[in-house]
């Protein structure tokens, strides 16, 4: 959208272009103002047949999944690289128990280059405290209506089998069971899709 273009005009244009949805974020205002704006944008996106993923913190859950199924996910958590900070494994495992209680979250899991200084983000020279398979497993554990992976395409092309695995994930899950876990320590889940 052009700067200062009215929201509804921009969303109507995306619908006309055949877009599936938008990733909306970086809203200004206090939490109450942001949540009011979130509800308005969710309604407008539904009107224009667009899914919406909120890339903003915090977008509080307000029952949107039931009323507005086009609101597929939101960043009601600390996501990877928030404030240029890679989160620790303990943060992930805590979010899996706490933040997902109210619905899907956009946490941006799935790094395949574990030293972020070598990516296009030269300003972030941190190691990702994980493994490649651990990052892929996080995409299964995190319930999200739209899995958003954060790395650059070249790194996914280096692991074609993992990219194929990510592409085959079918959400929403038909069945999800937490087999074992402790907040902040570990989680073991089983997921089943319709197939």
Name what the model sees in each region.
Residues 133-182:
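Catalytic cores of secreted or luminal carbohydrate-active enzymes
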Residues 117-142, 147, 192-195:
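Long hydrophobic segments that form regular secondary structure
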Residues 182-195:
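Carbohydrate-binding surface patches
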Residues 1-131:
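Aromatic- and carboxylate-enriched substrate-binding clefts and catalytic-loop regions
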Residues 68-69, 164-165, 189:
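Short amphipathic alpha-helical patches
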Residues 48-50, 70, 103, 137-138, ...:
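Structural beta-strand/beta-sheet cores of well-ordered domains, especially the beta-sheet scaffolds
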Residues 28-29, 59, 147-148, 194-195:
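Short, glycine-/Ser/Thr-/acidic-enriched flexible segments
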């Amino acid at each position: 959208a052009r700067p200062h273009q009215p929201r509804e005009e921009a969303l109507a244009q995306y619908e006309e272009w055949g877009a599936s949805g938008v990733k909306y974020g970086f809203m200004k205002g206090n939490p109450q103002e942001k949540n009011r704006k979130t509800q308005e944008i969710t309604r407008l996106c539904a009107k224009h047949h667009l899914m919406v993923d909120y890339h903003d913190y915090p977008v509080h859950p307000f029952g949107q999944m039931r009323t507005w199924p086009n609101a597929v996910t939101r960043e009601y958590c600390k996501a990877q690289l928030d404030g240029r900070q890679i989160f620790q494994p303990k943060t992930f495992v805590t979010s899996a128990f706490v933040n997902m209680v109210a619905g899907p979250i956009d946490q941006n899991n799935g790094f395949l280059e574990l030293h972020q200084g070598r990516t296009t983000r030269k300003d972030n020279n941190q190691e990702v405290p994980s493994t490649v398979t651990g990052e892929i497993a996080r995409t299964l554990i995190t319930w999200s209506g739209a899995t958003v992976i954060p790395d650059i395409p070249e790194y996914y092309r280096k692991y074609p089998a993992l990219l194929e695995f990510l592409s085959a994930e079918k959400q929403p899950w038909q069945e999800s069971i937490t087999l074992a876990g402790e907040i902040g320590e570990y989680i073991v889940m089983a997921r089943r899709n319709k197939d």
